[in-house]
């Protein structure tokens, strides 16, 4: 039995929960939270790893490899979108009459376990903003729970099971998964032309964000400078507070200054009064918006401006968000999750401002549909670095599309380098990078492995 419709008593009626693919970063926070709430958790995965080791230390019974025996005696089975429909454990659960639930649906149930669920949405900036809000609440002693799309060093992982009343959740719009949540407070950072292979049009994408906003129980926080976001907000009969730089939001960054190359500070104006000063410890003008969202939510939740400023000053970034890996031939090697042209532009412009002699970008295009649909935008943005190294497209969930290739992309970018593998990309950097360069790997696939190869000789 696949659980899709909401049943408010679902988690009241189960005790033993089994997670297929328990080593995944998306599963781990849910396992932490449910284990802390007293559920008997088991799991399985095909490979060992740091997450599985952490789960075992928590007392979770983890089996390496999938077997029908793993689900015997459990009350519910959780699976992610990455699990094949013919998975032996999923089929066994079906034959035994054990309810099965997809990870994003379970996350919706988990969001209802807390008095205040703070759900952060937007095409860009979700992980950073979710991490900033979690950092602020954590440093303020609120002990929040969290489910984040990247690793936050402060909490040593992708989430945590706190004892407080708050849970901070990264709300992803892919395949409408954020519509399974029940936000008490919600954030809409921006709405951009991504996942149109699923939605079909910007109109449908904006309608999904409208539905998400309408599900918010108390207050919506929206980016006043993002036209698509405000197009949605103007159609709502809901309580909305806004933040921005250019427009007069309820929370506004004024007197914005670059205190060192690529790093910004600003005065926080709440309505008509400057209430404090915020200095960011992460580079990039785009992070001002993420910090404003954090300030807006946390001020509403009862934190002081000083506590927000402390969080901004102490937050050094989340995993795979302009994360420094080390050096290669004296060049600094950084990895970033950017995979949409808007994100690439923000990240590359930030990198340009840092004062390095050359910027080398190693980009792994992600999905054929996105690469084809936004081809001209990718071409334009990949002209920003001094050298663009292009790897093969990572198709992920999509079948191969011979009409779109990395070679076609590279052919439109003067001076670009086309490689056939991550290993070849790393080798090219090892042979050509030099002191004074900044090398940045870009993409939401496994491009980070190339960064690790580049710095391996220096570790």
Spans of model-derived segments:
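A short, basic/flexible loop-to-alpha-helix module at the beginning of a structural domain
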Residues: 1-13, 67, 107-109, 323-324, ...
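Nucleotide phosphate-binding/pyrophosphate-handling subdomain across enzymes
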Residues: 2-3, 10-18, 26, 33-37, ...
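Phosphate-binding loop of NTP-binding sites
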Residues: 8-10, 33-39, 53-56, 70, ...
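Conserved N-terminal Rossmann-fold NAD(P)-binding element of oxidoreductases
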Residues: 17-22, 442
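Short internal beta-strands
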Residues: 39-46, 219-224, 360-364, 385-395
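Beta-strand->loop->alpha-helix junctions that form or flank phosphate-binding loops
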Residues: 44-45, 63-66, 101-108, 147, ...
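Glycine-rich, highly charged phosphate/nucleotide-binding loops
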Residues: 56-72
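C-terminal helical cap/extension that packs against the catalytic core
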Residues: 379-435
């Amino acid at each position: 039995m696949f659980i899709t419709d909401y049943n408010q008593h679902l988690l009241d009626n189960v005790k033993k929960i089994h997670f297929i693919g328990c080593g995944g970063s998306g599963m781990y926070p849910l396992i932490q939270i449910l284990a802390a709430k007293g559920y008997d958790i088991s799991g399985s995965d095909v490979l060992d790893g740091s997450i599985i080791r952490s789960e075992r230390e928590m007392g979770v019974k983890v089996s390496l490899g999938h077997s029908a025996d793993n689900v015997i005696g459990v009350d519910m089975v959780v699976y992610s979108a990455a699990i094949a429909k013919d998975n032996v454990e999923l089929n066994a659960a079906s034959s035994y009459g054990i309810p099965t639930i997809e990870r994003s649906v379970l996350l919706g149930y988990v969001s209802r376990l807390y008095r205040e669920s703070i759900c952060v949405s937007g095409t860009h900036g979700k992980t950073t903003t979710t991490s900033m809000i979690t950092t602020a609440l954590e440093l303020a002693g609120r002990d929040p729970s969290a489910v984040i799309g990247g690793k936050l060093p402060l909490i040593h992982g992708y989430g945590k099971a706190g004892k407080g009343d708050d849970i901070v959740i990264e709300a992803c719009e892919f395949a409408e998964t954020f519509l399974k949540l029940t936000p008490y407070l919600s954030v809409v950072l921006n709405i951009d032309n991504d996942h149109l292979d699923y939605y079909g049009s910007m109109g449908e994408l904006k309608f999904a964000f409208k539905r998400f906003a309408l599900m918010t129980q108390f207050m919506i926080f929206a980016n006043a400078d993002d036209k698509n976001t405000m197009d949605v907000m103007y159609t709502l009969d809901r309580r909305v507070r806004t933040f921005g730089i250019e427009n007069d939001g309820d929370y506004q960054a004024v007197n914005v200054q670059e205190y060192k190359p690529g790093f910004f500070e600003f005065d926080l104006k709440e309505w008509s009064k400057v209430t404090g000063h915020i200095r960011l410890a992460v580079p990039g003008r785009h992070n001002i918006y993420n910090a404003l969202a954090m300030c807006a939510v946390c001020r509403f939740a009862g934190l002081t401006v000083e506590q927000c400023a402390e969080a901004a000053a102490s937050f050094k970034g989340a995993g795979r968000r302009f994360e420094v890996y080390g050096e290669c031939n004296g060049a600094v090697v950084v990895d970033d999750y950017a995979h949409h042209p808007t994100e690439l532009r923000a990240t590359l412009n930030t990198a340009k401002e840092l004062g390095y002699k050359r910027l080398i970008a190693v980009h792994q295009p992600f999905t054929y549909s996105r690469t084809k649909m936004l081809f001209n935008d990718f071409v334009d943005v990949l002209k920003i670095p001094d050298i663009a190294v292009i790897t093969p497209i990572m198709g992920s969930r999509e079948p191969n599309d011979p009409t779109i290739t990395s070679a076609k992309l590279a052919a439109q970018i003067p001076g670009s380098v086309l490689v056939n593998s991550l290993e070849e990309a790393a080798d090219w950097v090892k042979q050509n990078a030099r002191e004074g360069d900044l090398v940045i790997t870009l993409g939401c696939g496994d491009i980070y492995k190339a960064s690790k190869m580049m710095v391996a000789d220096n570790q």
